Amino acid sequence: MKKFKHSGALGDLIYSLPIVQHLGGGEFYLHLNQMAWIGQHYYGALPNPFHQGRMTTKDYDYMQSFMLAQPYISAFDTMNPEREITHNLDRFRPSFVGHPTNYIDLYAQTFNIETTLSDKPWLTAPNPTPEHPVVINRTERWIPTTPGPVWHALKQKGLEKQSIFVGLRHEYIKFQGDTGWDVPWIETPTMLDLANVIAGAETFIGNQSSALALAIGLGVPHIHCEARTDMPLDRNECYFPKMTNVVYF
């Protein structure tokens, strides 16, 4: 039985799951409270404010039902020092420091996997909720000071009237203020709740986040990603050019 471990954050972990699936699955362990150490060890500073204090037992509880819904995950638990691990997914971190490519390809390179894994979905949501055709999540990380013209263009196409927003309440308030979109907010207490809402959508719109990772992993038919602009697109960790359902703006 293979035993995998990861320290987070949420999106990093979600993008590691194609490796777990490709290797036949197994048990998965979350290494808690490592974000500050990771920031200091690999970047010489604390992690960005949105990751500080994360990957605690609260995050584990949030993830648990979603992780166990994946057919290739036989168990999901927290890491302890006595736990034997066969595949340490945190091994990707030294190569990730320079942001050379997307997460999935980097994980594959780390584990010497030559098969292309970054061209297809890898996640399951057991109970998709199809009543929300357009799902939006826009966090406060890696967004421009002023939203680009694509938001206005999508609004002109009528997507606003079909949309709901998922994420934190303060993100929702900021999104409405930034874009002028007036859409309902749907609370999703667990990652599985969030995945079920996203899985039922025809379109996902959002920036770099765990919700975007879910949308890509679930294979939502149309994904509009508001990409970070502080580096070339082809070095963006969430850039998957072989996934034709994803466009970047």
Model segments located where?
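Catalytic machinery of carbohydrate-active enzymes
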Residues: M1-F249
